[in-house]
């Protein structure tokens, strides 16, 4: 008789995020099992509505699409790319403990999972210094292994999710016309919906 592995302690069902943009929808698995602080912070921001109405502020063809700065609510703001979430606390959805955002909404780096910055992955943006990730992240549309936290070099960007459907939408966003990497035609995030948690 086959075993029901869904009840096994090894079985892991991560939450899904559905991104509804003005260019279409895509879905991603969020790696709560692997990077619980990063994933829990992202989910908390999604559920609070933090990301709604923000625009992709940095798009580079063959590289990535960056998103999540509160200043990008105005797609023409010259401050887009410089902001983050407010300081505060959020629940670690894996452990049940309390985590915090501090020093400008930053969270602790989670350099534990060796998921590479491969096409379709969601990865934390930062200032280039440790523990400076907040709300900004990017969608890789190419193999950007030089950004892996475990690769040599200064750039360290932990992956916290991967697109499971709608990769064509992410690629289409990466190909829009830009000026100084900012899309000429603004691309807005209408909503991010979390399911499975």
PLM features per residue range, with description:
Residues 1-197:
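Cyclophilin-like peptidyl-prolyl cis-trans isomerases
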